């Protein structure tokens, strides 16, 4: 019966049945069960060894993973710190870039403003340069005109003195009427200085007209004169100096003319001075008297021309319309009248061509002019002479 029972199901066999078995069956069955148990224990031990081995492997792997994880965590921390550092640098760079951008915008705007300012200044400087060049050209023209006027005035003085030389050589003591039909030369020769004066009279009159206009402009009031805008300091100072000198000379002349003087009459002047000397005086006096001051002279000239055709030796009456003797010396008044009459008489002379004066004749004419100036200086007494007044450096050019 025991043989028929399964080996692995002994626990299910009841005890009564086991009692019925024989000893041999029981021993055999026990040994078999012990063998099975031993095999099971061996298998279990092997399995435990395998499990332990696998556990050891897993533990080792876990340790390695832990180490790797720790390393990765360390690397991650370093990377995190590096990222924070880089982020700080990025923020700083961004802030710095914004500051540089603002600085660049501000610098660009400032540079553009400065460039526009410098361009405006450059344009102004170009305009000022053009104005200075134009004013320099105008000043050159003025200087050339003043030089020409001064040279023309000197030639007028030399030419007008030739008639005095001819009158002295001819022994004429009085002023001769050039419109009475007689010869215009004392010797009747075509090469005399008086004849030469008739030839160049119109040219000299044109130059003297320019001198009169220039000096009338200089002697005009300050608000009537126009100084070009933008003149440099040297030119404006020079013009102001000229105006100051002209005003000073006008004041001195007015003071001189306000004191009456009756030393010389019209007859003495006409006997003492020949036409060349009186024309030289007229040339000097026109530097300080405008044409409006001589507006009453044509009445006197017309009366003189219609009366006798020659200059009379009588005194001039105060009812002639000219400035009274209480305002000007009689010598200057009579000299101006004689000069105006002679200028009107000389306009009737015919034009003739003659050669220029020789050097000897020019020297004689200059000496006669010096004599006339000395006479005019003696006529004013202790007062400043006309020559000192008229040679007041009013024609000096700016340095």
UniProtKB/Swiss-Prot annotation:
Cross-referenced InterPro entries: CCDC85 (IPR019359)
Annotated signal sequence range: none
Region (Disordered): 151-199
Segments forming a coiled coil: 52-84, 113-144
Keyword Coiled coil among UniProt keywords: yes
Keyword entries, A-Z: Cell junction, Coiled coil, Developmental protein, Tight junction
Keyword Coiled coil in record: yes
Localization (cell): Cell junction, Tight junction; Cell junction, Adherens junction
One GO CC term, this protein: adherens junction
Superkingdom in the source lineage: Eukaryota
Compositionally biased tracts (Low complexity): 155-169
Purpose of the protein: May play a role in cell-cell adhesion and epithelium development through its interaction with proteins of the beta-catenin family. May play an important role in cortical development, especially in the maintenance of radial glia.
Protein family according to the UniProt entry: Belongs to the CCDC85 family.
Protein name: Coiled-coil domain-containing protein 85C-B
Lineage, broadest ranks: Eukaryota, Metazoa, Chordata, Craniata, Vertebrata
Gene responsible for this protein: ccdc85cb
């Amino acid at each position: 019966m025991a043989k028929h029972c399964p080996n692995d199901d002994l626990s299910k066999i009841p005890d009564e049945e086991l009692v019925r078995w024989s000893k041999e069956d029981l021993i055999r069955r026990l040994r078999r069960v012990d063998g099975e148990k031993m095999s099971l224990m061996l298998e279990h031990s092997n399995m435990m060894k395998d499990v332990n081995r696998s556990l050891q492997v897993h533990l080792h792997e876990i340790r390695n993973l832990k180490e790797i994880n720790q390393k990765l965590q360390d690397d991650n921390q370093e990377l995190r710190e590096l990222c924070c550092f880089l982020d700080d640098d990025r923020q700083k760079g961004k802030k710095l870039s914004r500051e540089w951008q603002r600085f660049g915008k501000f610098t660009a705007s400032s540079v553009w403003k400065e460039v526009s300012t410098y361009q405006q200044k450059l344009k102004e400087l170009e305009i000022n340069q053009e104005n200075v060049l134009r004013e320099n050209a105008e000043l050159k023209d003025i200087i050339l005109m003043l030089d020409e006027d001064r040279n023309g005035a000197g030639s007028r003085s030399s030419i007008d003195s030739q008639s005095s030389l001819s009158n002295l050589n001819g022994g004429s003591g009085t002023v001769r009427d050039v419109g009475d039909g007689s010869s215009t030369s004392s010797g009747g020769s075509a090469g005399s200085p008086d004849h030469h004066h008739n030839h160049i009279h119109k040219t000299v009159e044109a130059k003297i007209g320019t001198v009169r206009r220039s000096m009338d402009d200089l002697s005009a009031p300050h608000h009537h004169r126009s100084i070009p805008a933008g003149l440099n300091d040297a030119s404006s100072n020079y013009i102001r100096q000229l105006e100051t000198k002209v005003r000073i000379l006008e004041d001195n002349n007015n003071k001189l003319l306000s004191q009456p003087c009756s030393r010389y009459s019209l007859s003495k002047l006409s006997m003492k001075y020949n036409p060349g000397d009186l024309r030289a005086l007229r040339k000097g006096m026109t530097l300080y008297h405008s044409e409006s001051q001589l507006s009453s002279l044509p009445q006197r000239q017309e009366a003189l021309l219609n009366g006798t055709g020659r200059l009379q030796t009588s005194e001039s009456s105060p009812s002639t319309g000219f400035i009274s003797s209480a305002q000007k010396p009689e010598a200057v008044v009579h000299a101006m009248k004689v000069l105006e009459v002679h200028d009107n008489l000389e306009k009737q002379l015919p034009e003739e061509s003659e050669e220029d004066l020789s050097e000897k004749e020019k020297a004689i004419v200059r000496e006669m002019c010096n004599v006339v100036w000395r006479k005019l200086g003696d006529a004013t007494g202790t007062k400043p002479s006309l020559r000192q007044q008229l040679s007041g450096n009013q024609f000096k050019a700016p340095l």
